[in-house]
Amino acid sequence: VSPTPGDPDAWNAYLAEGNAKQARKRVAADVLLRDALGRVLLVNPTYKPGWDLPGGMAEANEPPEEAARRELREELDRDIDLLGLLVVDWVAPHGPWDDQIAFIFNGGTLDDDQALRPHDHELSEARFTPLEEARDLVSERMWRRLDAAVKALNDGRPMYLRDGATGW
């Protein structure tokens, strides 16, 4: 028999037990930043192969957009105003990792005087790259997400992906 809200202690314990059984998703929050030429900002992480969009993993109970802003401050020493959501991607379990939800936010266009350099040990390099060259630098999974983010930006509406693919 389930407790009722009339018994607050029993009710809260019941809800806590249910919450403990719910799925926990890892959350990634990246940002699409471009320069005046339309090139995309990529970063080269020191802890994994290949290039990536700036951003990273959310901490426990941290909203994705705040995680994106925090990561940009930590990694590139920049406070960026996010201009909206571009992509939500459900990423299937792979390797040792459970599934995750990956977000890409629109960071807008940076002025020429806003050169970005790595600010912490997690990145070795940051550079603006033409989109067609980015494909060869990022993982296939990241490429699908990045390509969708650019399409979403051009279409003016966010996209939902399932493991990097549309048409689910």
Language model: regions and residue ranges:
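Nudix hydrolase/Nudix homology domain
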Residues: 49, 121-168
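Conserved Nudix-box catalytic region and its N-terminal flanking loop in Nudix hydrolases
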Residues: 35-74
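Acidic, metal-coordinating catalytic segment for phosphate/diphosphate chemistry
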Residues: 1-30
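Short Gly/Pro-enriched turn/cap motifs at secondary-structure boundaries
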Residues: 20-23, 95, 118
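Short, well-ordered beta-strand micro-motif
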Residues: 33, 104-108, 127-130
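A short coil-to-beta-strand element that immediately follows conserved catalytic motifs
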Residues: 78-87
